[in-house]
Amino acid sequence: MTTTPLSPSTPSNAQVPDIQGRFGRFGGKYVPETLMPALAELETAYQKYRHDPGFQAELQQLLRDYVGRATPLYFAERLTAHYARPDGTGAQIYLKREDLNHTGAHKINNALGQVLLAKRMGKQRIIAETGAGQHGVATATVCARFGLECVIYMGVHDMERQALNVFRMRLMGAEVRPVEAGTGTLKDATSEAIRDWVTNVETTHYILGSVAGPHPYPMMVRDFHAVIGQETRAQALEKWGGLPDILLACVGGGSNAMGLFYEFVNESSIRLIGVEAAGEGVNTEKHAATLTKGRVGVLHGAMSYLLQDEDGQVIEAHSISAGLDYPGVGPEHSYLKDVGRAEYYSVTDEQALAAFQRLSRLEGIIPALETAHAIAYLETLCPQLDGSPRIIINCSGRGDKDVQTVAKFLIPQ
């Protein structure tokens, strides 16, 4: 199966964002004046090249031969049996295997697209932020492939949790800059990357790793990941001659979920379910359930739901998963929540750890801790369902990077 071009097959989706970069009341550009010309330049370049045959041909060839797309749509037979009713009915569970991409996650779809764009814009220096390290690894990988200078900002706490990915980035020639400010996690790394971009905007392109940030990033990152949903549609039609009933994905910033959801936003019969990190519980102070518990505010250049205190100050997020440990969320997810098109729930660290083990033991697939949150929600979802609906879960990444973290919790010290 070949990958398909970026243009979505659901034309009315093109109505969001509007020309101001807004998804309803969310999104926009809340940035220093210094960055406005750079964002305008980026949007102009993106609109020019997204339909350019040469750009598309190069992107599709690299997605196929370098990344390894299309990724399989895998029927999880033993996971399905685990949730089956005594009469044999129950949800039919499929995994969209983004973990099989080069670098082990969905992140490379976007990193590759943005580097090809940066090259055409004449930028020789690339910066990025990373939490779990997968976006950093993907960016370092593509920069190595094209011989570009690469600087990755990563919180010191995340560097400890993801030491293997830090080594991978450095192995491929990237400079990894530790961020000690704040909680030393993804929010702080993003803030530091934006500061760098303000200072070096003439020579540097900032590859934001999620569907967050100022316009055009939420739109652009979504579009580079839309290949996930496009392949899923074709594979579902090929496998059973129809569409799925439910799509399920974890949500931190929300790029893997938007990549899967976007193709199906206008298919009103399909439930779109995002799963956030409840950490130690949504009624504690240690969680990252932004859409469940947040209020509207501005962070990193966009209006969206945020975790805030009574004074409107952004508060610390917590998750066992470094990739979900973020107090904001992409503005399109906020929009989909407000218009009632998508549903958002949360699972705890403990539930995610159990799901991490469950998928490993039942299917021989070790998922990323981020992905494990989506897997964990099956415990709640499956007993609620009638008949045998088809569920597709975005297996957004592999769990090699998390084995050390998980071992600390599961092996008595």
Swiss-Prot record:
Swiss-Prot/TrEMBL cofactor(s): pyridoxal 5'-phosphate
GO cellular component term, pick one: cytoplasm
Pathway listed: Amino-acid biosynthesis; L-tryptophan biosynthesis; L-tryptophan from chorismate: step 5/5
Record-listed N6-(pyridoxal phosphate)lysine modification sites: K107
Keywords: Amino-acid biosynthesis, Aromatic amino acid biosynthesis, Lyase, Pyridoxal phosphate, Tryptophan biosynthesis
The keyword Lyase is assigned to this record: yes
Entry's Gene Ontology molecular function annotations: tryptophan synthase activity
InterPro entries noted in UniProt: Trp_synth_b_CS, Trp_synth_beta, Trp_synth_beta/beta-like, TrpB-like_PALP, TrpB-like_PALP_sf
Catalytic activity of the protein: (1S,2R)-1-C-(indol-3-yl)glycerol 3-phosphate + L-serine = D-glyceraldehyde 3-phosphate + L-tryptophan + H2O
Assigned EC number: 4.2.1.20
Record flagged with keyword Amino-acid biosynthesis: yes
Alphabetized CDD domains for the sequence: Trp-synth_B (cd06446)
Function: The beta subunit is responsible for the synthesis of L-tryptophan from indole and L-serine.
Subunit structure, as described in the record: Tetramer of two alpha and two beta chains.
HAMAP family in alphabetical order: Trp_synth_beta (MF_00133)
PANTHER family for the chain: TRYPTOPHAN SYNTHASE, TRYPTOPHAN SYNTHASE-RELATED
Family: Belongs to the TrpB family.
Descriptive protein name: Tryptophan synthase beta chain
Origin species: Trichormus variabilis (strain ATCC 29413 / PCC 7937) (Anabaena variabilis)
Gene name per UniProt: trpB
